């Protein structure tokens, strides 16, 4: 499926929701917890791996050709790896909407939900990452080290004022877009 077809599909799919309804469905605890068992997202392969030929294309020796091409021209990384459609959703769990400072483990489920929204409505792969630190330097260093695996960084539910310093430092240091969801997302929704 082409990128433009995916974008049209996600827009069309979004319109199937009743936008006039402001009510949530009534849910039982069993229904909620059973649906969330083992998490809400999964990573799947875009390629078939049904034969030796498939394996040769997806991994060795075929992968070496792509690696060499990217090594010669690093701009190809977004065309031939998942980085072009991949967003890191990063939180320390210190400012989760409606829940406050619940820590990284409890916040992970919210980040999984954000990943679902990115996939369903924008066609992007969101990767939830929760970090067990509130130290801005540690957050910054960790995000800088993992940034080459992603096409963008989405900062989520990190308490102020640390979130503003972290965002500013990342924008100045890494070469991919950085979105501070609690700041930019609110501004986008407010102006929409």
Predicted segments, located by residue:
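N-terminal ligand-binding/catalytic initiation module
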Residues: 2-174
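A glycine-rich, Thr/Ser-enriched phosphate-binding loop motif common to dinucleotide/cofactor-binding enzymes
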Residues: 179-192
């Amino acid at each position: 499926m082409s990128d433009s077809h995916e974008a049209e599909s996600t827009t069309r799919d979004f319109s199937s929701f009743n936008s006039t309804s402001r009510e949530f469905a009534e849910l039982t605890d069993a229904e909620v917890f059973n649906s969330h068992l083992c998490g809400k997202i999964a990573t799947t392969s875009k390629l078939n791996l049904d034969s030796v030929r498939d394996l040769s294309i997806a991994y060795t020796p075929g992968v070496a050709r792509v690696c060499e091409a990217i090594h010669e021209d690093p701009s190809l990384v977004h065309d031939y790896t998942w980085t072009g459609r991949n967003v890191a959703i990063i939180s320390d769990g210190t400012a989760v909407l409606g829940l406050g400072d619940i820590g990284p483990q409890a916040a992970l489920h919210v980040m999984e939900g954000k990943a679902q929204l990115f996939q369903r409505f924008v066609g992007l792969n969101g990767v939830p990452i929760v970090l067990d630190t509130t130290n801005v330097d540690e957050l910054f260093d960790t995000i800088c080290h993992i940034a080459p695996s992603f096409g963008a960084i989405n900062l989520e539910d990190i308490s102020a004022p640390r979130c503003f310093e972290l965002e500013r430092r990342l924008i100045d240091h890494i070469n991919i877009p950085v979105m501070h969801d609690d700041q930019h997302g609110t501004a986008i929704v407010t102006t929409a």
